[in-house]
């Protein structure tokens, strides 16, 4: 029995992510995707028009709610750590994909093919609320308006991931993200990571 359109898209998209991660986006053809997904070319073109179309599909079906569990957020000690968990998940996803494919995604975003920046800033409303709570509870000492400060945490994540991709993975992306976020927000000393925690961060 033939797969429904949505199931076929999911099957191809998951196979595509494996192929892109293992071989690199530019080295993978539509034929490779069809073979990996176990579908005919005609089936591929029934639901997608190109490799880029697969990437667009993946981005349209990804948001903060799908990458971070409520259990993780509830287990965090404070709202700053909740913001960190969300931002760090984007870092983890990029490391799982590898620096080369992450660089490809950034390139596609610059070409207007996907909205990488929009995906990250889909959490802005969360970050604004969490920032306001942190300021109220003395975790964040910066007096900048939450509406300005919260979204900057996403920008920091992009900055460090860009540096990591440019340096082919030889960059302390996680510790730099944490250090810069703490500095930007002027996080109270009691809530900052220790030197040992920063050192251990990039071993994960």
Q: Where are the model-predicted features located?
A:
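Short secondary-structure transition hinges
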Residues: 91-128, 139, 148
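C-terminal peripheral helix-coil segments that are non-catalytic and often amphipathic
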Residues: 92, 125-137, 155-204
């Amino acid at each position: 029995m033939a797969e429904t359109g949505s199931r076929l898209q999911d099957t191809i998209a998951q196979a595509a992510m494996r192929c892109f991660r293992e071989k690199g986006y530019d080295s993978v053809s539509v034929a490779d995707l069809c073979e990996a997904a176990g579908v005919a070319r005609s089936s591929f073109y029934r639901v997608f028009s190109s490799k880029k179309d697969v990437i667009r599909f993946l981005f349209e079906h990804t948001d903060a709610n799908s990458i971070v569990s409520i259990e993780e957020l509830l287990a965090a000690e404070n709202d700053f750590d909740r913001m960190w968990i969300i931002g760090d998940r984007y870092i983890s996803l990029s490391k799982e994909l590898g620096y080369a494919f992450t660089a490809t995604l950034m390139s596609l975003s610059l070409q207007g093919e996907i909205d990488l920046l929009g995906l990250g800033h889909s959490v802005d409303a969360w970050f604004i609320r969490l920032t306001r709570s942190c300021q109220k509870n003395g975790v964040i000492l910066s007096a900048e308006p939450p509406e300005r400060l919260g979204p900057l945490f996403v920008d920091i994540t992009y900055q460090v991931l860009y540096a990591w991709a440019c340096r082919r993975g030889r960059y302390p992306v996680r510790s730099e993200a944490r250090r810069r976020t703490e500095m930007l927000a002027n996080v109270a000393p009691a809530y900052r990571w220790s030197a040992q925690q920063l050192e251990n961060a990039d071993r994960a």
